[in-house]
């Protein structure tokens, strides 16, 4: 049995979505920008969307899987005030407190 490595990414935010094409070679991200972000998936990594806000990256090489997940996360890192953006599934985001009057 071959060991596979998984990396789950959650997209948090109203209207933020992810999808792939039929072959799974291109990842489409709608992250609140005026355009859709297209990411070419590396051949050694397989990407699929379990839900519109949950991305699963899998592959045989742990370094390549986590590197691609980091590239996806860098498209929209989590905000420090509201927490919107892309984050790892078990990641804890420390939010800042807003202004006080």
Swiss-Prot record:
Q: Which Pfam families match?
A: Ribosomal_L6
The cross-references to Gene3D superfamilies, in alphabetical order and at most eight, read: Ribosomal protein L6, alpha-beta domain (3.90.930.12)
Q: What's the name of the protein?
A: Large ribosomal subunit protein uL6m
Q: Name one GO cellular component term.
A: ribonucleoprotein complex
Q: Does the keyword Lyase apply?
A: no
Q: Which UniProt keywords apply?
A: Mitochondrion, Ribonucleoprotein, Ribosomal protein
Q: What organism does the record attribute this protein to?
A: Marchantia polymorpha
Whichever gene encodes this chain, its name is: RPL6
- Answer whether the UniProt record assigns the keyword Ribonucleoprotein to this protein: yes
Q: Which InterPro entries match?
A: Ribosomal_uL6-like, Ribosomal_uL6-like_a/b-dom_sf, Ribosomal_uL6_a/b-dom, Ribosomal_uL6_bac-type, Ribosomal_uL6_CS
By sequence similarity, the record places it as follows:
Belongs to the universal ribosomal protein uL6 family.
Q: What's the superkingdom here?
A: Eukaryota
Tell me where in or outside the cell this protein is found: Mitochondrion
Annotated GO biological process: translation
A molecular function (GO) held by this record is: rRNA binding
